Regions:
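A short secondary-structure junction signal
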Residues: 100, 120-123, 176-178
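Basic/polar N-terminal segments that are highly enriched at the extreme N-terminus
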Residues: 1-4
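Active-site environment of divalent metal-dependent phosphoester hydrolases
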Residues: 16-18, 57-58, 93-99, 117, ...
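Conserved beta-strand hairpin/beta-sheet module of binuclear metal-dependent hydrolase folds
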Residues: 12-77, 177-190
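Core dinuclear metal-dependent hydrolase active-site scaffold
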Residues: 6-9, 39-43, 49, 152-183
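Metallo-beta-lactamase
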Residues: 69, 74-80, 84, 114-167
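Active-site metal-binding motif and surrounding structural segment of the metallo-beta-lactamase
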Residues: 65-111
Length: 190
């Protein structure tokens, strides 16, 4: 029997910025283009998943981002205790998607092969391509691999009935992962 999921968007951060800061190489039409930061909860009757882990207060301060609430607090607002989360899906390893290393102590992390290859490979030899990554996030994921807490996916994988991960055709780069819940009963913004 397949599950039906509710999708929650949990806003945890904000950055007042201009368009120049949103695009590699800048934007000649610079103007205000603020950015909000979200993690997602995919909540089923039988099982729930966290999609991306956000960043914590020290990382936000380092990168001059406003932390509106800690990710764990936002999850608790919808009834999810981070200590009991069993599955986390990481879309990609940018600092705002893969931080909070110890927030989910029991979780198994789902990650695309291509993403780990990208953030540990030759692309990181280029300073401009490293900007959205934090070495601590990458090494924390390597530690999770050695602790048998990472499940790698190569393209489309069903991780639960009606829930798949896949390599997205991303504007950022081809290695990003995208989850897709085929059956969503409702979508709520929190």
């Amino acid at each position: 029997v397949s599950d039906t999921y509710e999708l929650f968007a949990i806003r945890y951060g904000h950055h007042h910025r201009t368009a120049t800061h949103n695009f590699l190489g800048g934007d000649p039409h610079d103007g205000p283009m603020p950015l909000d930061y979200f993690v997602w909860a995919i909540v089923g009757k039988k099982r729930s998943f966290v999609f991306d882990t956000g960043f914590d207060a020290p990382r936000g301060e380092k990168r001059q981002r406003t932390l509106l609430r800690p990710v764990g607090e936002g999850l608790k607002m919808i009834g999810i205790n981070p200590d009991s989360v069993e599955d986390v899906i990481i879309s990609h390893m940018h600092f705002d998607h893969s931080g909070n290393h110890s927030l989910f102590p029991k979780a198994r992390y789902h990650l695309q092969d291509t993403e780990m290859k990208y953030c540990t490979g030759r692309c990181m030899c280029h300073q401009a391509l490293r900007i959205p990554f934090e070495v601590d996030d990458v090494t924390a994921m390597v530690e999770k691999i050695f602790a048998d807490r990472v499940v790698f996916h190569d393209g489309v994988s069903e991780i639960a009935p009606n829930l798949t991960v896949r390599v997205a055709l991303s504007t950022q780069r081809r290695s990003s992962s995208l989850e897709s819940a085929a059956t969503l009963s409702t979508a709520r913004y929190r």
